[in-house]
A protein has these predicted regions:
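N-terminal acidic leader/helix
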Residues: 1-25
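Generic structural signal of hydrophobic/aromatic residues within well-ordered alpha-helices
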Residues: 22, 26, 44-47
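Short, charge-rich amphipathic interface segments used for partner binding and complex assembly
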Residues: 35-62
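Charged, terminal alpha-helix-loop-beta segments
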Residues: 65
């Protein structure tokens, strides 16, 4: 699965160490988005959909950009 730089940065910010934990945190974050924050909602939805297609082993192999 290919993630772009923006997606990887979002994942890095909310990463709990597990794929399902990250999905949960992204869903939780979406609850706090304002109606005009559509770009972040679209970005996070795309990341969640891609994460659903990964296995936990594939997620563990992901490399996040350095801080």
């Amino acid at each position: 699965m290919n993630f772009n730089h923006e997606e990887l940065m979002l994942m890095m910010l909310y990463n709990t160490g597990t794929r399902l934990g990250l999905i949960h945190e992204l869903r939780l974050m979406q609850c706090y988005l304002m109606p005009d924050e559509t770009a972040l909602r679209v970005l996070s939805e795309g990341v969640i959909e891609k994460l659903k297609l990964l296995t936990d082993a594939e997620f563990a192999e992901l490399e996040f950009p350095p801080d």
